[in-house]
Amino acid sequence: QGRPSFCNLPAETGPCKASFRQYYYNSKSGGCQQFIYGGCRGNQNRFDTTQQCQGVCV
């Protein structure tokens, strides 16, 4: 598979309390899904749009 390894990481909200709508690649379903990002830390499996997510991970 040609997708980056970070695409297999789980969605990670992080410890901060903000509420940003972001998208992550769900390796179980094989598609991009929305999640709420807290604004800090987290991991690389986080995108501003579903199109960005699909472009990198699908």
UniProtKB/Swiss-Prot annotation:
The UniProt record lists the BPTI/Kunitz inhibitor domain at 7-57
Pyrrolidone carboxylic acid: which positions carry it?
Q1
Q: Which cysteines are joined by disulfide bonds?
A: C7-C57, C16-C40, C32-C53
Question: What are the residue positions of the site described as Reactive bond?
Answer: K17, A18
Q: What do the Gene Ontology cellular component annotations say?
A: extracellular space
Q: Which residues form the signal peptide?
A: none
Kindly report the protein's main subcellular placement as a broad class: secreted
Subcellular localization(s) per the UniProt record: Secreted
Keyword vocabulary terms for this entry: Disulfide bond, Protease inhibitor, Pyrrolidone carboxylic acid, Secreted, Serine protease inhibitor
UniProt xrefs under InterPro entries:
Kunitz_BPTI, Kunitz_BPTI_sf, Prtase_inh_Kunz-CS, TFPI/VKTCI-like
Protein function: This is one of several isoinhibitors of broad specificity that are secreted into the mucus of the snail.
- What's the protein name? Isoinhibitor K
Q: Record the organism.
A: Helix pomatia (Roman snail)
Single Gene Ontology MF annotation: serine-type endopeptidase inhibitor activity
